[in-house]
Amino acid sequence: MADASIEFKGTSFTLSVLHLKTSKLADIRADLVKKVAQAPDFFYLVPVVVNIEQLDCSIDYQAVKTLIEEFNFTFVGFTGSVDKEQRKLIRELGFSFVNTTRVDTSQKAAIAEKAIVAESKVTAAIPECNLYTDKVHRGQIRSGQQIYAKDQNLVVIGSVSAGAEVIADGNIHVYGSLRGRAIAGAKGHHKAQIYCQNLEAELVSINGNYWLSESMEQHWGSPVYIHLTDSELTSSKLI
C-alpha cells in the first residue's frame, strides 16, 4: 500500500499572546494603534492568540477577531478562560480555544532532562553563533533600510536609525546607537545576543522573543547586551 499523502503530528509553536485588560474595543484599538506603529513590519501577519483571563465581563468575540485582523495580525483563537460555559460559547461561535499546559514540578524535572538530551542531539545540526562569520556594515543604517546577515553575525560600525531594521541569523553588534529594530537568531538560535553602545530601539527580538521600547526602560540610553535566559529576554549593562 502506498504511503498516505498526509500525516498528523503533534508539535509546539511560539505564538504571540495579546492579553486584554478591558472589554472596551475603543481602548483596545487605541493601544493597538500605538503598538503596531512602533514596528509595523514586525507585526505584519504575526499569529496572535487573545487572552481573556483578566476580563471580568463578557466581550464581543467576533468584534475582537475583526479588530485583530484589521491590524493585519493573523487571528488564531482565544485562551485564558477557566469558565466552561464561556469556552463552549467561544467554540460554538466558530473560534478556536487554545488550552495552555500547566506542568507540575516532577513533570518539569523530567521534561528538563529530556530537553538536555534533545539539545545534545541537535547541537551538531545547528552551529553556535560564535562559529558564524561576520558580516560588517560600515556607516549609518538609515530609516527604511534593512540589512540581513544570512547565516552570519552582523556587525554595524555606526548607528541604526529609527525606522531601520537589522537582522542576523547569529549575533548583532551595533557600535553606535540602536534606534530601529534588531532581530537576532532569526533562524532559531536561542543563544544569539544583541550588543549596542546606546539602546533606544523600537524593537529587539531573539529567536522570536521580542521587546518593544517600553520594555527597555531599565537600560534605556545605555550600552547593553540582550540575551535569552529561560526563554525570556534579559538585558545587562555593558561595563
Swiss-Prot record:
Organism per entry: Colwellia psychrerythraea (strain 34H / ATCC BAA-681)
Biological processes, Gene Ontology terms: cell morphogenesis; division septum assembly; regulation of cell division; regulation of cell septum assembly
Family under the similarity heading: Belongs to the MinC family.
SUPFAM superfamilies in UniProt: Cell-division inhibitor MinC, C-terminal domain (SSF63848)
InterPro entries: CAP/MinC_C, MinC, MinC_C_sf, MinC_N, Septum_form_inhib_MinC_C
Function: Cell division inhibitor that blocks the formation of polar Z ring septums. Rapidly oscillates between the poles of the cell to destabilize FtsZ filaments that have formed before they mature into polar Z rings. Prevents FtsZ polymerization.
Top-level division of the source organism's lineage: Bacteria
Gene3D superfamilies: 2.160.20.70, 3.30.70.260
Annotated keywords: Cell cycle, Cell division, Septation
Lineage: Bacteria, Pseudomonadati, Pseudomonadota, Gammaproteobacteria, Alteromonadales
UniProt-recorded name of the protein: Probable septum site-determining protein MinC
NCBIfam families to which the protein is assigned, alphabetical: minC
Quaternary structure and partners: Interacts with MinD and FtsZ.
